[in-house]
UniProtKB/Swiss-Prot annotation:
Belongs to the NadD family. It comes from Buchnera aphidicola subsp. Schizaphis graminum (strain Sg). This is Probable nicotinate-nucleotide adenylyltransferase. Its EC number is 2.7.7.18. It catalyses: nicotinate beta-D-ribonucleotide + ATP + H(+) = deamido-NAD(+) + diphosphate. GO terms for molecular function: ATP binding; nicotinate-nucleotide adenylyltransferase activity. Pathway: Cofactor biosynthesis; NAD(+) biosynthesis; deamido-NAD(+) from nicotinate D-ribonucleotide: step 1/1. Keywords: ATP-binding, NAD, Nucleotide-binding, Nucleotidyltransferase, Pyridine nucleotide biosynthesis, Transferase. It comes from the Bacteria. Gene3D superfamilies: HUPs (3.40.50.620).
Amino acid sequence: MKEIYAIFGGNFDPIHYGHITSAEKLSREISIKKIILLPNYGPPHRSKTKTSIIDRLKMIKFAIKDNKLFTISYLETKKNTTFYTIETLKKIRKKIGYLQPLCFIIGEDNLNNLNIWKDWKKILSLSHLLICPRIHIKKSNPKLKKWISDHTTKNSNLLHKKPFGFIFFSKMSMLNISSTAIRKSYYEGKSACGLLPSKIDKYILSKNLYKIYNQN
């Protein structure tokens, strides 16, 4: 079987154990060789992040230091540029070729909103979708139900045999940690050290990153 590369995008504002531990669990579940963290300057379908990309990148580097599973992509870190997943996947495909199995990791909540993404149906022509379960998720989007069902597999071996085209729902339990809750804790003068690496906690406190609370 061919080795899988996976892309894990997000604001990472800040990156925390929920991100890292969940990704590590996924790598063990379906034998992922490399996870590419894809921090974005600000996704087009969400309100813009308040923390600079420079600070977020520094925190990501703290989180993955000496962890060979992870690497960072800077494709979506450019200022004043709108990034769409479909365009980023095309760029990554040009770099790694079309025979390499590739998974794009998203949460179950994002899957239910996939129909608002640009050219969302074409995503499976470039990668698999690897879905992380979410607690208290809303019912599935009826507009997507059949499409999801038609492309879902329970056989993780197919993710290795085919370079793209499938949706796979992880069976792993994920840590229920929220970046929003972490930002709120720092805004209220509390530490969230148990939810993220101590170096990131110290960095946040030294830079006063979340003095202004952003709930998005």
